[in-house]
Amino acid sequence: MSRPEELAPPEIFYNDSEAHKYTGSTRVQHIQAKMTLRALELLNLQPCSFILDIGCGSGLSGEILTQEGDHVWCGLDISPSMLATGLSRELEGDLMLQDMGTGIPFRAGSFDAAISISAIQWLCNADTSYNDPKQRLMRFFNTLYAALKKGGKFVAQFYPKNDDQVDDILQSAKVAGFSGGLVVDDPESKKNKKYYLVLSSGAPPQGEEQVNLDGVTMDEENVNLKKQLRQRLKGGKDKESAKSFILRKKELMKRRGRKVAKDSKFTGRKRRHRF
C-alpha cells in the first residue's frame, strides 16, 4: 500500500473529498484520539496550557486537547480543505493555513508546548525540485524552538518510512537545541508500532513539570552508532579524503611495477582557478 506522502503533496492529497472521508471515519477518530492522549501523557502538562497543534488537519487532535485539561490551542495545517472541514465543526481552537516546512510564524516564547500527530513525516518528502527535506527540517525545528517558552515541550507522533528519516529528524532537532529522544510504543508489532518524538527546549522554570521521558530509547550518539552499524552491514566505508585516496592508489601502482610520480607537498591539492 502506497504512503500518502508518495502520492501527492499534502495540500493536494487532502482535497475536499479526502478531508470529509478522513474526518468522518470513526476508525481514524479513534486512532487520532488514542495517539493524542498518549502525546499528552508524554507532555505531562499543567492544566490550561497554551498548545500549538502542528498539522492539525480538521481538528481531531484539537478536540482532545480541549477535553483533556482544558488546554487552549492553536492549529496550523497546509491543507485548505482540512481547515475548512475543521471550521465547519465549530472547534474551540484557532486555525491557520501554514506550511510547517517554511517555519512556525509566531512570536518568540508564545507557546507552553507543541504537539503533532501524523504530520512531520511529510517534511522528509521532497514534493518539488526546490524543496530540500533537510533544510525544511532545520527551518521547522529552529522556528519551533523559538516559538516555545523556555522549557517548552514538543511531542510528535509520526510514521517514518525508514531509519534514515528517523536519523534526519532526530539530528535536526538536536542541532536546533532540543533535548530528548524517541519513544517507540509496541516495538515488536509491525502494525501497531508507534513513534513519538519527545523533546524539550531547555530547562523549565523552577517548579514546573518536566517532560515525561520514560521510555526514550534513542539519542544522538545512538543514532550515529546505528548509522555506522548499517553502513558496515551494507558493506559501506567511511568517506576517504582525496589525498589519502591518491596516495593509496599510487602505492598500489608501485606494487604493480608501474612508473609513478614522486610524492610532494602538492600531492592531492586542488589547483587554483586560473581565471
Swiss-Prot record:
It comes from Saccharomyces cerevisiae (strain ATCC 204508 / S288c). Belongs to the class I-like SAM-binding methyltransferase superfamily. BUD23/WBSCR22 family. The keyword Nucleus applies. Keywords: Cytoplasm, Methyltransferase, Nucleus, rRNA processing, S-adenosyl-L-methionine, Transferase. SUPFAM superfamilies: S-adenosyl-L-methionine-dependent methyltransferases. Signal peptide: none annotated. InterPro entries: Bud23-like, Bud23_C, Methyltransf_11, SAM-dependent_MTases_sf. It catalyses: guanosine(1575) in yeast 18S rRNA + S-adenosyl-L-methionine = N(7)-methylguanosine(1575) in yeast 18S rRNA + S-adenosyl-L-homocysteine. S-adenosyl-L-methionine-dependent methyltransferase that specifically methylates the N(7) position of guanine 1575 (m7G1575) in 18S rRNA. Requires the methyltransferase adapter protein TRM112 for full rRNA methyltransferase activity. Important for biogenesis end export of the 40S ribosomal subunit independent on its methyltransferase activity. Required for efficient cleavage of the primary 35S precursor rRNA at site A2. Involved in positioning the proximal bud pole signal. Its EC number is 2.1.1.309. Interacts with TRM112. Interacts with ECM16. GO terms for biological process: endonucleolytic cleavage in ITS1 to separate SSU-rRNA from 5.8S rRNA and LSU-rRNA from tricistronic rRNA transcript (SSU-rRNA, 5.8S rRNA, LSU-rRNA); ribosomal small subunit export from nucleus; rRNA (guanine-N7)-methylation. Changing residue 77 to A: No effect on growth and budding pattern. GO terms for molecular function: rRNA (guanine) methyltransferase activity. A motif (Nuclear localization signal) lies at residues 257-264. The keyword Methyltransferase applies. It comes from the Eukaryota. This is 18S rRNA (guanine(1575)-N(7))-methyltransferase. Residues 256-275 are annotated as: Disordered. Present with 1620 molecules/cell in log phase SD medium. GO terms for cellular component: cytoplasm; nucleolus; nucleus; tRNA methyltransferase complex. It is found in: Cytoplasm; Nucleus.
